[in-house]
Amino acid sequence: MKRSRRPFTTNLASAAIAAANIVCAHSAAAAETIPLEAFGRLPTLENVVISPDGTKIAFVRTRSDSRNLLVATLGKQEVLGGARIGDTKLRQVEWVDDDNILATVSGTSPPPYGFIGATREWFQLVNFNVTKLKVVPLSFDIMPKRTFNVVIGDTAVREVSGRSTLFAPGLCVEESTVPCQFSFTYPERRTKLIDESMEADTDWAMDESGRIAAKFVYHDDKKLWEIKTHKDNHWTLAASGTAAIDTPRMLGFSADGAALIVRFTENGDGVWKPLNLKDNTWGAPLEKGAAFSRVIEERKSGRIIGGIRGVRSNHQYVFFDNELQAHWDAILRAFPDERIELESSSDDYSRVVLKVFGARDGYVYALYDWYAHHATILGRAYDDVAAPAEMRAISYPAADGLIIPGFLTLPRGVSEKDLPLIVMPHGGPAAADSQGFDWWAQALAAQGYAVLQPNFRGSTVDSSFLEAGFGEWGRKMQTDLSDGVRYLAHEGLIDPKRVCIVGASYGGYAALAGVTMQSGVYRCAVSVAGISDLRRFRKSIVENELHISQRYWDRFIGISSKDDPEIAAISPIEHVGSVNVPVLLIHGRDDTVVPFEQSDVMLSALKRAGKSVELSTMKHEDHWLSRSETRLQMLQASVAFLKANNPPN
């Protein structure tokens, strides 16, 4: 990645202006029709993280065309400083220690000069010292070793000999690029190479003292995985096995730090097993963690202190420590009837930052002080959306009887009868929509549409529900969506003659499949970065030597090889002759996940077939709609198209 300019620059004047009102009062309810700009812009407030000692808060504030990373003290709310972000794609903000903030940024570019390979999204680390008000990109340079100045995985912070040390995986250059583990010792941010691997799929586990406890290595060509432990500068093979797709995953350490917790997949279910780091023996499976969709780790030790269980309409936070669980239960009581997510916490959990979603507060960030037993609203995520539309949890039976959970967002101020409907399947498809603030669904509801977001089979509701989607692309995963339309029509909520389908990524595929392989359900389709040609998509994965990815997609799609006739059967591009409704394609030029080519070839095929089709190209946009300008472009293009082909009034 070129580094012709720093991704951040310090700008204390704008920081002071923007940070002065991080704590804000609730505004009056919004007007009936909220403009698209209110949803298309990046959030007014995001990435709100509290310092380890609980005395400071960092956050990203966007006002008009100004976007800043800011730091303020809690209590007096004094501004310590800030850094101007501009159009940098900021992905994550976290504290290294009480004086340093680490920002992860990304950009789309080819490999560095002298190397071949596909254009991809490259991630870099930037350090912001809040005492010296200095912004410095972290350097992975280790002479004479050749390295790329990029990060390729999760970071970890440990305290080593009284000094904060950041650990991050990067890339070293041998005959090809290989993953390496680096350390950065603060305050100088001194860089050290501590390990490297010859296999692309490698992960390291750092113990509380900052030593490598173990690493996971996957040999893609052999489908062989290994877990090796590290002691006295010697590697010992602790476990190995073969897996074409579902490999083990290191999660963190046990409560006493003596064991590494590894998640295995057995008979489709997740199983946690402890590996004793002293003698490399395996303990009995742990029941308490098997159902967690995500673990909660102690920041400076990597010890697992709890987890999150995903359910259809909420997430359940579970802490193993009784006092921490009491903290969380008190928080839930402070926000009755609202959905709460833990955004960040002080090291002792006495102060936590929360995302709060609900009818009372809308979508806000809040600070809860355990000792004061008091919650304070820090600010609204979207300033101009004070009263979001209701997002209602629903469920309905699919044709084969499987219960499909989902969410229905209803426009404000209208009768819940015979509404125009937008079906909006999520991407992934191994993902799931959850109850909260969805800027895209809210934007459509503000225009007068009901929005159905089904968690079709193949979604990550639980392991069996996920597996129910294997081999069902364009089949039952597709009819799960239209079954939702029929259900809502039967309930009298929507008008079945006024339904369109809109989606991104896999959702974009589903939108195209809904008007090529189905007929009479939808009046129009909007595909954002959708897959149209599965054969071409599979070829792009194979060309990049992503063998485990290829096997993953083959299983999910339900094909056995590049010559499988089912590829054509479920590729929208092979069925353009069946299209009898207008289609809008939207795609970012910088998309490195679903190539822009997927929309380009679909455009040509539909035009050759004489169908009604448009393509809206988003310049400098990636797969994730990361920029305000192009996110708004997508909303404006899709809403104009929907109003022309499925008027809400």
Question: Residues of each region from the PLM?
Answer:
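Active-site-proximal cap/loop segments of hydrolase catalytic domains
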Residues: 456-649
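Non-catalytic accessory segments flanking enzyme active sites
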Residues: 202-205, 307, 316-413, 439-442, ...
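N-terminal export leaders
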Residues: 5-11
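Cap/lid segment of the alpha/beta-hydrolase catalytic domain
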Residues: 385-497, 504-505, 539
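Signal peptide processing junction and immediate N-terminal pro/mature segment
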Residues: 24-30
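Bacterial N-terminal signal peptides
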Residues: 14-24
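Beta-propeller folds
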Residues: 19, 30-352, 359-361
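Short coil/loop residues immediately preceding or within conserved phosphate-binding loops
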Residues: 36, 45, 66, 90, ...
